[in-house]
Amino acid sequence: MKRKLTAKEYTYVASMLFGLFFGAGNLIFPVHLGQMAGSNVWQAILGLLITGVGLPLLGVAALGISRSNGLFDLSSKVNRPYAMFFTCALYLTIGPFFAIPRCATTSFTVGLEQVLPQNGSNTLYLLLFSVLFFAAALFFALRPGKILTWVGKILNPCFLVFLAILVVVALLSPSAAIADVEPLGDYASQPFFAGFLEGYNTMDALASLAFGIIVVQVIRDLGVDDPAAVAGSTVRAGIFSSLLMAFIYIAVTIAGTQSRGVLEASENGGTALAQIAQHYLGSAGLFILAATVTLACLKTAVGLITSCAETFSALFPDGPKYRIWAIIFSLVSLLFANLGLSAIISYSLPVLMFLYPLSIALIALALLGKFFGHDRTVYCWTIGFTLIAAVYDLIIALPESVFNAIHGPAIKAFGQQYLPFADLGLGWICPTLIGTAIGLILHFMRENRAKA
C-alpha cells in the first residue's frame, strides 16, 4: 500500500481538481463582487475564498477520509430517505434547475447580447441561442467521445491565456484606485459576510460532494488506500489548484473593482466581464471572450447533463434510462435558461441558502467523524437542527412577493430575535452546533453505558 503520491501524480490530481471546480461561469461572480465591494474588496475576497475555494477542497477531502463512495453513501449516514432527498436536491441544483441553464445564459450575456440592438428582442434571441446551445449539449451528451476531451484540453489553456491577457491589461491600466471606489449594498456594511455568501453562487462546495468521489477514486487507483492518506493526498494536491483558483478570483475581483472608474456596477457579472473585455481589448477582445466562454460553458453543460443523467438512472433503476434523463434535463435546462442570467442567479439564492448549511454540516461531520465513530445519532441531530435553520434561511431569501405571502416579515423578526447571526445570513451556525452537542452527548452516554 502506497502512502503518498509522486510529484507527477500530485500534478495530475491537482490539474483534475482545478478542472473539476474552475469554469468560465465562475468568473461572473468575482467580477461582480469586485464592482460591488469597492474599497472593501479585500474583506469581501476573504469571504469569497472561504466558500468558493476552501469549502470545495474540504468537501473532496471529506469523501476521502470518510471512505464514502459518493454523495448518496455519505448522506446515508443520516438515513436513506434523507440521502435520497439531499442527493436529488443537490444534483437538480447543480444540474437542470440552475447551473446548466446558467451555462447558456452566461454565454449569451457575455457574447451575443453585447452586440444585439437594445430593441426589446433579446428574449427571442435568448430563446434561439439557448435552443441551439442545448441541442449541441444534448448531441454530445448522447454521443460521449474524445471530441469533448480534446476541446477541453485545447480550450482551457486558451481561455486561461486570454483571461490572463485581459486581467493583466486591466490591472496595469486601472481606471480607478480601489480606495476611491464606493462599496454598494451589503458590501458597504458587512463585506466579509457578503463575500462569504457570494461564494455560495459558485456552487463548488455542492459540486465537491457530487463529483469529488472522482478525484478520490483516482487517488485510490494510484495506490493510496489509507483514508487519512487519501484525504492528505487530496489536500496536498489541492493546494496548487486552490492557490491558482484563488489567484484567478483575486485578480478578476480587483479588475472588477477598478473598472468602476469607467463603468457603472452591472446587473450581473456576465455583463461586467463583457464590458471590461470590450473596454480594454476592443471588439476583437469581446469576440474572443465570447467564443471561449461559450465553448467552455458548452463543455461544462455536457458534463453536468451527463453526470445528472447517470446519477438519476442509478438512483431510480426502474425509471427512465440514461438517454431519457439526458433529454429531460436538457429540456428543463432550456426552459429555465430563458429566465435570463440575473433571474437564474436571483432564484437560485433561496435554494443555495438552504443547501449550503446542510452541505457544510455534512462536510464537517465527515471530516471529524473518526472522533465519534461516524455515529448516526450525531449525524441525525446535527443535520436535523441544521435543516430547521436552513429552511429559515431559504424563507428569508425568497422573492419579496412570495416572502410576504407566507408571513415572511414575522418569520424574519422571530429569527433575528432568537437566532444569532441570522441578520448575516448565517443563522444556521448556532443550531448546527447545538445539534452536534446533543448528538455527541448522547453518543458518549451510550458509549459509557456500554463499557459499564
Predicted segments — roles?
Residues 70-76, 248-298, 305, 314, ...:
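TM-loop-TM module centered on a large, flexible mid-protein loop between adjacent transmembrane helices
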Residues 141-170, 349-360, 379-389:
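Membrane-interface loop-to-helix entry segments
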Residues 173, 184, 375-452:
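A generic transmembrane alpha-helix motif of multi-pass inner-membrane proteins
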